[in-house]
Curated annotation (Swiss-Prot):
It is found in: Cell inner membrane. It comes from the Bacteria. This is ATP synthase subunit b. Pfam families: ATP-synt_B (PF00430). CDD domains: ATP-synt_Fo_b. The chain crosses the membrane at residues 10-32. F-type ATPases have 2 components, F(1) - the catalytic core - and F(0) - the membrane proton channel. F(1) has five subunits: alpha(3), beta(3), gamma(1), delta(1), epsilon(1). F(0) has three main subunits: a(1), b(2) and c(10-14). The alpha and beta chains form an alternating ring which encloses part of the gamma chain. F(1) is attached to F(0) by a central stalk formed by the gamma and epsilon chains, while a peripheral stalk is formed by the delta and b chains. One of its GO terms (molecular function) is proton-transporting ATPase activity, rotational mechanism. GO terms for cellular component: plasma membrane; proton-transporting ATP synthase complex. InterPro entries: ATP_synth_b/b'su_bac/chlpt, ATP_synthase_B_chain. Keywords: ATP synthesis, Cell inner membrane, Cell membrane, CF(0), Hydrogen ion transport, Ion transport, Membrane, Transmembrane, Transmembrane helix, Transport. F(1)F(0) ATP synthase produces ATP from ADP in the presence of a proton or sodium gradient. F-type ATPases consist of two structural domains, F(1) containing the extramembraneous catalytic core and F(0) containing the membrane proton channel, linked together by a central stalk and a peripheral stalk. During catalysis, ATP synthesis in the catalytic domain of F(1) is coupled via a rotary mechanism of the central stalk subunits to proton translocation. Component of the F(0) channel, it forms part of the peripheral stalk, linking F(1) to F(0).
């Protein structure tokens, strides 16, 4: 056993750790503790980042749902507004068509009245001319004074009948 290299290696190993173990163990433990602290800090940071990401995901989901609700409401409002505008445009078009139709009827009525006046005036002119022609050919030369005198005499009674 004293001549075994394994025995002496084990003794050297134990002596090495007995003599230098405390001095070697402290920095080694400090390095391992420091690494463990860094890993723990990294894990804490990763957990914090995960919580932030989950919170951001919840916020984004909530905002998306809110935006969808607002978009639906906006589309619904737009459809209602479009229907209202179309209805208003239809009513305005009907009102314009009615006004134009009434204006056309008024123009037609005015044209009819004007045509009737013109026809009456032409009829009166023709009747007057025919009367002149008939009177000029049928009446003797002295009869015109007697007719005018009789018309002047009948004038007050004709005016009184007309006023009543």
């Amino acid at each position: 056993m004293l001549h075994e290299p394994r025995f002496w290696s084990a003794v050297a190993f134990v002596l090495f750790f007995v003599l230098f173990g405390k001095k070697l163990w402290t920095p080694l433990a400090a390095a391992l503790d420091s690494r463990a602290d860094r890993i723990r800090a990294d894990l804490d940071e990763a957990a914090r980042l995960r919580r932030e990401a989950e919170q951001m995901l919840e916020d984004a989901t909530r905002e998306r749902e809110t935006a969808m609700v607002e978009a639906r409401a906006l589309v619904e409002h737009s459809l209602i507004e479009a229907a209202r505008i179309a209805d208003e445009a239809r009513r305005e078009a009907e009102a314009v068509a009615t006004r134009r139709e009434q204006m056309a009827r008024d123009r037609i009525a005015a044209s009819e009245r004007s045509a009737v006046r013109e026809v009456r005036q032409v009829a009166i002119d023709v009747a007057i001319q025919a009367t002149r022609d008939v009177l000029a050919t049928a009446l003797p030369a002295g009869a015109d004074h007697a007719i005018v005198d009789r018309a002047i005499a009948d004038l007050p009674s004709a005016l009184s009948h007309r006023a009543a």
